[in-house]
Amino acid sequence: EYSNAQLLDLFSIFSANPDKLTMVVIALATSIASTGLPLITEAVTLKDRVGLAKLTSGNLQLFSFFMFPATFGVMLLAYPLNTLFYTPDSLGSNVLIQASFVGLFLGLYMLVSNMLQGMFENKAAINYLVIGFLVKLLLQYPAIRLFEVYGPLLATMIGFAVSCTLILKRIHEVAQIGRASCR
């Protein structure tokens, strides 16, 4: 069991500290999603399936091009970044690494949910968010018990992974993406 002081330390390491640094990386995904949204909506309105498939594929490739290096850069520099902004602490650095990895899923969710809403599938986007949130709620307590400070991040990652999987499946159906249409 933990003392109140230890719990407060763990909570500060988990809650606020890594989020400030990972949100910079997540902002990249949000900007990618925002710039592609009008083009996706236009392609849906014009019933341009080939253009929609190319835009969808291009957005996912652009996301990968920026997010993977940015995320892995933060992961590699976790200890120096954590030391620069907070204090030298290996647990805080490890939580930052995990939070950066979770940020990939959050960024992907931002991208694909925007794309799905641009395809006028707002109800599906909300339903998939709710499903992911319910998965997170179900996993939160067991994950905290098993993985302690990493538990909430793991539950969040799995919840967003479920939402992203459902959204990507729906995008595939709506955009009728095939291998030939993305060339």
Q: Which ranges hold each PLM region?
A:
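Transmembrane alpha-helical segments of multi-pass transport proteins
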Residues: 132, 179-183
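Helix-loop junctions and terminal segments of transmembrane helices
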Residues: 27-47, 56-60
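Interfacial transmembrane-helix starts/ends
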Residues: 15, 48-65, 69-77, 92-99
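Interfacial segments at transmembrane-helix termini and the short loops linking adjacent helices
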Residues: 6-8, 75-106
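Hydrophobic/aromatic residues within the transmembrane alpha-helices of Major Facilitator Superfamily
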Residues: 24, 28, 32, 69-72, ...
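Short alpha-helical transmembrane segments in multi-pass integral membrane proteins
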Residues: 55-75, 150-175
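Short runs within selected transmembrane alpha-helices of multi-pass transporters and secretion channels
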Residues: 94-120, 124-144, 149-172
